[in-house]
C-alpha cells in the first residue's frame, strides 16, 4: 500500500492533475491552391496542388498532431475546407474550429488556422500600413489574431507571413527593407494593442522569410531594454535548426519561427520545440513544420 501511495505521488509530480497541455504548430504548406506549376516535368496552367503533395502534408500534420495549427500559403476557403475535411476523416482527433484570412485582392496565398480548442475571438488585421520609399503600403497578407482560453488563462496567437525575398526593386535587394518595415509595423501594432507592461500572453508564429539575426526578427524580440518575445529553439531529430529548403540553389535556411512573450514563455515545456523532419517531408512543402508544447 505504501509503495502504491509513493507511486501515485510521483505520478502527480510528473503529470499535474489540473494541467492542460496544448501543442501549437506553424506550417507553410507551399502553394496549397490553383496556379500555373510544373508537374511531373510538364508545365500546367491553373493546376491544383498535386494530391501526392497534399497527402504528405496531411501525413506530417497527423504525425505532429497539433492542437492548434497555423497555416501559410493556403488558397481560397475551399482549399482550407478540403484539408480540414481530410484531416478530420483521418481519425487524428477532430479540428472543430477554423479561421481563414484573405490578403490583398490580388494575393493568392493566405493565412489560416485549424484548432481543436474553442476560439474565443478572432480578428484579421489587414490595415497594417508603413512607409516604403515615400509611399504608404500595406502588408499584403495581413496579420491574424486568435484568442484562446485554457484553464482560465486567456492567451493569443498571431499568425503572419512576411514578404518574400523576391523583388523587382534594385534599390532594395531581396526586399530586405520592405520586410523590415512590415515586421516593424506588425510589432508596433501588437505592442500598442497589448503593451509589454501589461504582461500580455501571446505567441507569434509563421514564415518570417528571414534569418535569426536579421532586422525583421530583431524587431519582434526587443525594443531598447524591453524584451518583447523569446525565440523558441526549434530543432529537428538531428539537432538542426533549418526549416526551409531552396532547391534552386540547394540551400537550407531557418525562416519559420515561434516567438513567445515573457508571460507565454512561462507555460512553454522545455525541450518541446521541434521541427518535423519525417521521411519525405520536403515532397509536400519546401518548409518543415515547427511546433512546441505549452502546459497551462
Region locations from a protein language model:
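Metal-dependent phosphoester/phosphodiester hydrolase catalytic core
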Residues: 150-158, 162-184
Amino acid at each position: 500500500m505504501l509503495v502504491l501511495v509513493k507511486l501515485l505521488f510521483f505520478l502527480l509530480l510528473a503529470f499535474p492533475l489540473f494541467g492542460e497541455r496544448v501543442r501549437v504548430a506553424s506550417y507553410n504548406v507551399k502553394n496549397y491552391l490553383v496556379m500555373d506549376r510544373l508537374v511531373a516535368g510538364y508545365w500546367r496552367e491553373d493546376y491544383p496542388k498535386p494530391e501526392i503533395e497534399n497527402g504528405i502534408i496531411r501525413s506530417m500534420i497527423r504525425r505532429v498532431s497539433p492542437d492548434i495549427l497555423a497555416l501559410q500559403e493556403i488558397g481560397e476557403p475551399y482549399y482550407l475546407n478540403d484539408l480540414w475535411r481530410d484531416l478530420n476523416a483521418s481519425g487524428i482527433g477532430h479540428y472543430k474550429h477554423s479561421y481563414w484570412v484573405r490578403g490583398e485582392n490580388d494575393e493568392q496565398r493566405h493565412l489560416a488556422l485549424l484548432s481543436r480548442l474553442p476560439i474565443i475571438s478572432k480578428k484579421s488585421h489587414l490595415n497594417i500600413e508603413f512607409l516604403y520609399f515615400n509611399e504608404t503600403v500595406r502588408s499584403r497578407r495581413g496579420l491574424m489574431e486568435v484568442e484562446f482560453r485554457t484553464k482560465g488563462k486567456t492567451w493569443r496567437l498571431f499568425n503572419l507571413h512576411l514578404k518574400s525575398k523576391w523583388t523587382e526593386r534594385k534599390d532594395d535587394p531581396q526586399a530586405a527593407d520592405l520586410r523590415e518595415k512590415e515586421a516593424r509595423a506588425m510589432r508596433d501594432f501588437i505592442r500598442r494593442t497589448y503593451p509589454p507592461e501589461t504582461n500580455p500572453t501571446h505567441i507569434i508564429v509563421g514564415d518570417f522569410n528571414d534569418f535569426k539575426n536579421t532586422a525583421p526578427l530583431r524587431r519582434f524580440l526587443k525594443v531598447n531594454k524591453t524584451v518583447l518575445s523569446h525565440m523558441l529553439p526549434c530543432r529537428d531529430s538531428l539537432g538542426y535548426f533549418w526549416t526551409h529548403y531552396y532547391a534552386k540553389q540547394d540551400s537550407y535556411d531557418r525562416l519559420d519561427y515561434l516567438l513567445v512573450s515573457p508571460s507565454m514563455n512561462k507555460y512553454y515545456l522545455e525541450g518541446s520545440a521541434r521541427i518535423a523532419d519525417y521521411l519525405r517531408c520536403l515532397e509536400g512543402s519546401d518548409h518543415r513544420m515547427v511546433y512546441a508544447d505549452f502546459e497551462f
